[in-house]
């Protein structure tokens, strides 16, 4: 059985699979948890940290994205390392330096034991093409946002099993989507497992999930192309570049409004003011904490936002 490599944020899954390992995005188990960590800032990292320390999350090693995304993961990842878990620290360059990032990929490859099957990258590229087609179906009102989101969020690790993941993609149905407004969801993904279904219930069709879209947008066929493409990971670079990219997606997807999800104790919360200054759309900002079903307060806010968008000219 292949060794399981936990990843704390986006790490090119192409390279992990090519090294003969099985990636597991530790964040993807968090929304389904009922945990209430005693020691936490961000619940996302605290939940997976406790699951690793207790053995509930069975991984052979851990890759911590220590530069270019989540800051809390750096400390919680070190706690996992101090418990004896083999751990590697992975850094995205803020300035997009391709040579630097290629060196990061080379170091990661060494940690993982070296490339064994680079041909598997072609299959991952094909699966990502299917993900893009699925995303396009959603934009064209031919797939439910909740179905598409559950698929796209899994592209960070392709569910650790390419065959099973392909079957999952096969099972997503086409649907005629009825809604009152088209919205974008920016920021980190909601920690609430039912968020998309709740939004759909109020007539909000989420046609853009910012972070999961990065998982299918970026790719490559070898170290050089992976380095070139993944340095464009929007969450790891200047906020100005990210705003420009979001603006372009909002225009193409013809959105009526924007939901900015923020996580308690996450540095990305500080970006809300910037988005409000530069995105010329009605914006609803919501903040989550623990992994739980959507609260009644959140439902009321989503309902009010939907009603406001419906009456806007």
Predicted segments, located by residue:
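A charged, amphipathic alpha-helical module
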Residues: 2-3, 106-219, 235
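Trp/Phe/Arg-rich N-terminal binding region typifying the photolyase-homology
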Residues: 1-120, 196-199, 207-313
């Amino acid at each position: 059985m292949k060794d399981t490599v936990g990843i704390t944020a986006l790490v090119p899954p192409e390279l992990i699979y090519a090294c003969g390992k099985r990636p597991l995005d530790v964040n993807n188990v968090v929304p389904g948890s009922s945990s209430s960590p005693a020691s936490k800032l961000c619940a996302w990292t605290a939940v997976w940290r406790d699951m690793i320390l207790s053995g509930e999350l069975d991984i052979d090693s851990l890759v911590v994205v220590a530069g270019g995304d989540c800051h809390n993961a750096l400390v919680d990842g070190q706690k996992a390392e101090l418990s004896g878990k083999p751990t590697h620290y992975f850094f995205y360059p803020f300035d997009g330096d391709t040579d630097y990032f290629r060196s990061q990929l080379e170091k990661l490859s060494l940690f993982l034991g070296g490339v064994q099957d680079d041909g598997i990258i072609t299959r991952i590229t094909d699966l990502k093409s299917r993900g893009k087609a699925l995303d396009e179906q959603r934009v064209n009102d031919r797939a439910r946002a909740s179905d598409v989101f559950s698929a796209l969020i899994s592209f960070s690790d392709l569910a650790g099993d390419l065959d099973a993941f392909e079957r999952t993609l096969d099972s997503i149905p086409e649907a005629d989507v009825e809604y009152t407004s088209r919205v974008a969801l920016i920021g980190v993904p909601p920690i609430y497992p039912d968020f998309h279904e709740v939004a759909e219930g109020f007539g909000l069709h989420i046609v853009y999930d910012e972070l999961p879209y990065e998982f299918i947008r970026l790719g490559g066929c070898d170290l050089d192309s992976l380095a070139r493409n993944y340095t464009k990971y929007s969450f790891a670079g200047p906020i100005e570049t990210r705003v420009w990219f979001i603006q372009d997606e909002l225009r193409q997807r013809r959105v009526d409004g924007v939901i900015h999800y923020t996580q308690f104790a996450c540095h990305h919360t500080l970006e809300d003011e910037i988005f409000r200054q530069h995105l010329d759309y009605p914006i609803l900002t919501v903040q989550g904490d623990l992994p739980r079903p959507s609260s009644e307060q959140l439902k009321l806010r989503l309902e009010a936002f939907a009603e406001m968008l419906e009456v806007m000219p």
